[in-house]
Amino acid sequence: MNRSIRKVAVLGSGIMGSRIACHFANIGVEVLLLDIVPRELNDAEKAKGITAEHPAFRNRIVNDSLQQTIKASPAPLYSPGFASRIKTGNFDDNLADIKAYDWVMEVVVERLDIKKSLFEKVDALRKPGTLITSNTSGIPIHLMAEGRSDDFRKHFCGTHFFNPPRYLRLLEIIPTPETDQSIVDFLMHYGDLFLGKTTVLSKDTPGFIANRLGIYALIQTIRVAAEMGLSVDEVDKLTGPVAGRPKSGTYRLSDVVGLDTTVHVANNLYSSGEGKDESRDAFVVPEIMQKLYDNKWLGDKSGQGFYKKVKDEAGKSVILALDFSTLEYKPSGKVKFETLEGTKAISDVSKRFAVLVAGRDRAGEFYRKTFADIFKYASLRIPEISDEIFRIDQAISAGFGWQYGLFETWDAIGVKNMLSIMESLDLKPAAWVYEMLAAGNESFYKVENGKRSYYDIASKTYKKIPGQESFILLSNLSDNIVWKNAGANLYDIGDGILNLEFKSKMNTMGSEVIEGINKGISLAEKDFRGLVIGNESSEAFSAGANLAMLFMFAIEQEFDEINMVIAQFQQTMMRARYSSIPVVTAPHTLALGGGCELNLHADKVVAHAETYMGLVEFGVGIIPAGGGTKEMALRCSDMYHAGDTELNILQTAFMNIAQAKVSTSAQELREMNYLQDKDQIVLNRSRLIVEAKQAAIELADNGYTQPKQRNDIKVQGKTGIALFMAGIAQMRLANYISDHDAKIANKLAYVINGGDLSYAQNVTEQYLLDLEREAFLSLCGEKKTLERMQGLLNGGKPPRN
């Protein structure tokens, strides 16, 4: 059957239900969100004369839940307007409406009796062939299907999203023995392609994959930390970015998730593990967690947990950390370990792991104990929770935001090396690990001919990870590098397309990266058909220009050097726009300043849905001068139509730059006019480079012709400058901005309006680029601009001087 999903019904509007509904709305699906009818009228409803039959009363729970979710931070919707795609109702009046829906997803309270009762009603109302899934995080899927019709059971499956579903990539697909294989295949594909998820096939076992191993790792980390006397700050430092994990580390993660949630899952895993899990006692909640739980110090939801946010005497927010010895909160301290110092020069996280476990201080001991324990446990869970190691790694990476999964981390340390550490701690992994090594296989993964293989335990051979044909992984293509320097690699990714990867810190655009862009264009024009600019960084597509270099030149008053650097940057951006081959960019995460300008000059942008892009130069006392200001003037000019109030259109672009606005999604970039109709948004980050490559191929196949530079950009001249400056003066008078803000804004107004022209007229791109560069240079000579740059470079926020 050729299945498509146009309408989804979500049953249950709690935190997860409402957020899942929002994410389906993000992808353009029509959503029906249902919940129970309230027990009785509240005082506000009585005062308004609302009756028990009125929809405002009957849908109060679902409407309140949805509105609360929409207002949450981070936002669950790509754009607030997408909320119109969600229709609300209640189980009593609207459950029969599910007949018209393609997928019905249950997200009610975690009680088997309630779920089974609801599914009995759903079974009687659904049309045959409708997908039915549950978002349970722990109730056995097969138990929910008991007593249901044959057609229901064939189309029933677990679909476990991680919270928040917009941002966390994991979607576990958990079939029962009766689930039709075509349904499993469809959900795996749909979750990947349309929802942007890493879909992981999981067995119907307690906690599935991610929670089983993730909660084990969290609790054991807390237990080891308590035994070693490590503080909250120390543990979160050790389990944060230095180990390729989110900044939240361990304790902050617990506060975000909610201690009650963690305790609930741990207790369930303990109960369900009786007679089945040799390490069942590991799920006994540690004493410190139990104390916090009993005190109702549950984390963010209760206002305090392992951390607490308070106001200091100056009214400034301060984060305090719990002192385990006193159960009082104290200011976070600076964490320093010799082992961590030894990793500062190692940018590749995978190369840090061996250094971390080799440390001779308490940090090294912590890593050895925690890694050894979780690796042992993971090895023993095969084949119980999964038959394949790669699914375990995918679940942990996508569910918890780790750059490397458990077996990938073990590989990076060295399987034999880690085994020695485990044995020194009297820990013994599964027998299959010893068998693998005895057969001469010394790693869990291999890369051959650009494809990654995993060690398959059942066959005792290496097998290719399925689904790789949908992705291009640069980390697998080291043999395909055709040119490189200290800041960039150029890969031949096949079919006549090159890919330029930045590899500087935060992918900032210094001289090596600029050289790489020019080299990529030159090689592509000579021997290839197109150029993709994309990378696999977890931090940034590009955080912009190399501010440290610019600051150094400005301090030394090397204005000729600055002029040369900016002119070269502008020329490179223009070359990306006006080369003889298509240039396609693939932004994701952060694309700031110069990183944004590069995308503005591409023939096509293939952006990940979670792209946070903006022209942010104003914040450090300058204006965009890599063609960003010019490009926004050009795009506004293209939007002018007869009868338009042109200055209103231009003012929006001006404000986006003056406020250093950064998008909260790729969809918002469309609304900001940073993405255009020709550009594309991709939901699954893993597909980004392959989609960008396909876009470059299509442009080439369709007869790409080298564009001509524009000479028809309409600017407003003195009229526009005067109006903008009047507004700036009013802002200054009202004390909304500082004198220096006003000075920068006036420079921006001058450039974006085309300078000192007597009347509105058409100008060239180069004319605007020259204005940009002139304004940029003058601002680099300002003391307050240098203070802003220095503030950012010192790791803080630029002062609002």
Region locations from a protein language model:
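N-terminal glycine-rich phosphate-binding loop for ADP-containing cofactors
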Residues: 1-538, 548-581, 588-595, 600-602, ...
